[in-house]
Amino acid sequence: MNDLDQLEKKIMDEIAEAGDEQTVEAVRVAALGKKGTVSEKLKTLGSMSPEERQVMGPAINGLKNRVTEALAARRAELRDIAIAARLEREKVDVTLPMPRPPAERGRIHPITQVIDEIAAIFGDLGFSIAEGPDIETDYYNFTALNFPEGHPAREMHDTFFFEPDEKGERKLLRTHTSPVQIRTMEAQKPPIRIVIPGKTYRSDSDATHTPMFHQLEGLVIDKTANVANMKWVLTEFCKAYFEVPSLNMRFRPSFFPFTEPSLEVDIQCDRSKPGEIRFGEGNDWLEILGCGMVHSNVLRHGGLDPDEYQGFAWGMGIDRIAMLKYGMPDLRAFFDADVRWLEHYGFRPLDLPTLFGGLSS
């Protein structure tokens, strides 16, 4: 037993003096390796009598376990020492100003910028933001919005349908954000004042259309909402968005299944210079959005009594009004992931649009 005590002391001293991982490994091999001192002791158990093995077996195995634990503890200690030394060597004074990057690459996409501008304008007018699912049912996308059977929008060439489920029902990618109007009417009681920015999907692709685009819709429901209120809201929005002090707008009769009466809105502009549009001046007109009083059938589908409540709604393409305001000629470039395009048309991340500080500073 004295031999084991002396051997243990020797090995433990070597472990304690080991100053790096390589030395610790050398001590391990010398003690526990195939021909190590502790391993050799274990080999002698086979030549001992049963009585001797009862005494020496636990003693030698206990030594092996203690050496193994000591080696692991020393390795962990050396790792902690190395980490502390590295932290001391590589420490950073966080009180010093950060050096400016050689080039500011990150930019906010124009669509994100325009949605933020829209939120700032309508937020100032007392509206809240509403959202809904991109994958919709036929009921919310068409039926509840007064689209009759056989309407062209229900055809495959205009709408992306999924395969029918086990019940024979087909989900679809929403063709407008109008389904959120129905969901909002179902979920809350009037008065309702919401705007709904979001992605929409239609089977169309050219310089001014893409299969996926962004749309803004608005909805106001209460007991006294009228066309005059709608004209005021839309005029104030267009003046704020295009950042002009005054703006003439023209409301023309139109048709949408979900509104009655339905109107299309043109805004005053000057297109006398090629490739340039100036709003709030000139003798030209440009169609900007569609609007109207919410159809009584839509109110009923939303769970409201049209004899008690009325409202107005409008919709416009976010991508299109972004192109008009910031002079971008091709809608398809919005989705090309070209960093050069984004550096040219994008916005600095910290320039958040506000009515007080300027929408597009």
UniProtKB/Swiss-Prot annotation:
Amino-acid positions noted as binding Mg(2+) in the UniProt annotation, renumbered to this chain: E260
InterPro entries in alphabetical order: aa-tRNA-synth_II (IPR006195), aa-tRNA-synth_II/BPL/LPL (IPR045864), Phe-tRNA-synth_IIc_asu (IPR004529), Phe-tRNA_ligase_II_N (IPR004188), Phe_tRNA_ligase_alpha1_bac (IPR022911), Phenylalanyl-tRNA_Synthase (IPR002319), tRNA-bd_arm (IPR010978)
Subunit description: Tetramer of two alpha and two beta subunits.
Cofactors (names): Mg(2+)
Localization per record: Cytoplasm
UniProt-recorded name of the protein: Phenylalanine--tRNA ligase alpha subunit
Family: Belongs to the class-II aminoacyl-tRNA synthetase family. Phe-tRNA synthetase alpha subunit type 1 subfamily.
Gene Ontology CC: one annotated term: cytoplasm
Keyword field: Aminoacyl-tRNA synthetase, ATP-binding, Cytoplasm, Ligase, Magnesium, Metal-binding, Nucleotide-binding, Protein biosynthesis
Chief localisation class: cytoplasm
Cofactor: how and how many bound: Binds 2 magnesium ions per tetramer.
HAMAP family reported in the protein's UniProt record: Phe_tRNA_synth_alpha1
NCBIfam families: pheS
One matching Pfam family: tRNA-synt_2d
GO terms of biological process kind: phenylalanyl-tRNA aminoacylation
Catalytic activity of the protein: tRNA(Phe) + L-phenylalanine + ATP = L-phenylalanyl-tRNA(Phe) + AMP + diphosphate + H(+)
Listed EC numbers: 6.1.1.20
PANTHER family per UniProt: PHENYLALANINE--TRNA LIGASE, MITOCHONDRIAL, PHENYLALANYL-TRNA SYNTHETASE
GO terms, molecular function: ATP binding; magnesium ion binding; phenylalanine-tRNA ligase activity; tRNA binding
